[in-house]
């Protein structure tokens, strides 16, 4: 699995990959999650920080859990370091 620059980018990649694996368009995912297609597009581009309630809605529409999406994103992002 390739690593991405931030957790937001990694989450965007995970959501996009899951959506395409399920054969869903952005519009269908948005409809199923009760969100606007432009918002889903922005999430997949990494343009938006996704809120918890929207992450849960997207996860349900993708037939998975928010925690599973986050775990996959965390595995793809570089470890954070504290200073």
Regions found by a protein language model. Name each.
Residues 1-10, 79-80:
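A detector for short, charged/polar N-terminal pre-domain segments
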Residues 34-48:
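Recognition helix of helix-turn-helix/homeodomain-like DNA-binding domains
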Residues 15, 29-30, 40-43, 69:
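Conserved hydrophobic/aromatic packing and binding residues within compact polymer-binding modules
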